[in-house]
Amino acid sequence: MNSPAPVGSPAPVSAPSLDVAGLAFAYPDGHQALFGVDFRVERGERVALLGPNGAGKTTLVLHLNGILTGGAGTVTVAGLPVGKRHMAQIRRKVGIVFQDPDDQLFMPTVREDVAFGPAAAGLTGAELEARVDRALDQVGMAEFKGRPPHHLSFGQRRRVAVATVLAMEPEILVLDEPSSNLDPASRRELADILRSLDVTVLMVTHDLPYALELCPRSLILSEGVIAADGRTGELLADDTLMRAHRLELPFGFDPRSVTMGA
């Protein structure tokens, strides 16, 4: 739990984008995936969630917008507890971009895919079109508005998938392996887009150089707990920590030689 502010200290300007406290969860078959996860992400931060397969990363992400509930502990998004009472608001505030963009693109055109969420939330007319146009502009896909998604490249489809989430104007953008299956040019384009967004980002990835490039801070989730929380470059340069949690950098990659961008 977070300690109360000392007497006489100024009140915080706003609640953090995400506050996870004591989160534990077991599946119905008895498998315990999370054992008490604690962390917070401030507004505007870009944070990488790292960890080996089976660490509990997917289980954690599915708690952030209430897809999974019922374990111990709490998840709070922009001051709202994740639960039935606030579920509609939470799902607008937490946008998840899945690893496979085809899981999110199912309408005949790019425009219809991006409009789907806001339209379901009640937007219509000029307000809806403005929301769609703004989201497509943010990912550099405005010129493809009338195209069928299946006619686009994989990298373009991933950018449209990001736009479908941005159209909901989320508090937090959660990305699951955003660099997977991208060629170098698409990888660079997506990185530039993510850096330009005025939104909190939580990036789940095994791509450690991409995490270093985009996220000043990283969390290592291992065996259902946060094993480390710190500056990405410092964590990746800690050989003992990396080995302990089965994380490996590409051959020849030295995080100490990389200058972090903003």
Curated annotation (Swiss-Prot):
UniProt xrefs under CDD domains: ABC_cobalt_CbiO_domain1
Cysteine disulfide partners in this protein: none
Membrane topology: Peripheral membrane protein
Key words, A-Z: ATP-binding, Cell membrane, Membrane, Nucleotide-binding, Translocase, Transport
Pfam families: ABC_tran
Enzyme Commission no: 7.-.-.-
EC class: translocase
GO CC, one annotated term: ATP-binding cassette (ABC) transporter complex
Predominant localisation class: membrane
Classification via InterPro entries: AAA+_ATPase (IPR003593), ABC_transporter-like_ATP-bd (IPR003439), ABC_transporter-like_CS (IPR017871), ABC_transpr_CbiO/EcfA_su (IPR015856), Co_trans_ATP-bd (IPR005876), ECF_ABC_transporter_ATP-bd (IPR050095), P-loop_NTPase (IPR027417)
Entry's localization field: Cell membrane
Any one biological process term the GO annotation gives: cobalt ion transport
Domain called ABC transporter: residue spans: 18-248
Domain of life: Bacteria
Residues holding ATP: 51-58
GO molecular function, one term: ATP binding
Cross-referenced NCBIfam families: cbiO (TIGR01166)
Function text: Probably part of an ABC transporter complex. Responsible for energy coupling to the transport system.
Family: Belongs to the ABC transporter superfamily.
Name assigned to this protein: Putative ABC transporter ATP-binding protein SAV_3608
Protein species of origin: Streptomyces avermitilis (strain ATCC 31267 / DSM 46492 / JCM 5070 / NBRC 14893 / NCIMB 12804 / NRRL 8165 / MA-4680)
